[in-house]
Amino acid sequence: MAKVIVYDVYTQALQVYRLNESDPMPYAYGRTMLVGEFRGSSGSSVLWTTNAAMEAWNATRRTYGSPIPFRYAFKRIWEGGHGRQSQHYAGVAFDVGQALSSAQRNRIWNVANNLGVWSYVEPQSMTPTWVHLDKRY
């Protein structure tokens, strides 16, 4: 079971949930992102994100129209694997599409980049086998 904290950017309030790994993430429509998927390889029992990041995910997933597999979203800073200012530590970054073809990743990248809901969509030259999306502030 995980404690999931969601910062509501509209009300500036924190919402706290206690969820199982197989439960959908708060604000994710349907079952397009489960708590266990959001956690990825993190060993933390406390996870956090924002409703704005989840809304950006929803828009991307709806526009793409198919499942988007991912392996990495949340990380604690001491768990490593990312730079010191990684948005994964803030719970607002998603590395997606690792299991997809290059053409499918290109389509995800184009959808995410053209929607305008993400703060940053990493250039494909920097992430050749995945797509990095984040809703940084």
Please give the residue ranges for each predicted region.
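Extended, low-complexity, intrinsically disordered C-terminal regulatory tails
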Residues: N51-G83
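Intrinsically disordered, low-complexity segments enriched in small/polar residues
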Residues: A28, F38, W78-G81, N114
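Selective for proline/serine-rich intrinsically disordered segments
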Residues: S22-P24, P67, V121
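Extracytoplasmic cell-surface/polysaccharide-interacting catalytic and binding patches
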Residues: M1-A59, R136-Y137
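Catalytic cores and adjacent binding grooves of peptidoglycan-active enzymes
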Residues: V4-V9, S44, G83-F94, Q98-Y137
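N-terminal start-of-chain detector that recognizes signal peptides
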Residues: S42-G43, Y64-R71, A103-R107
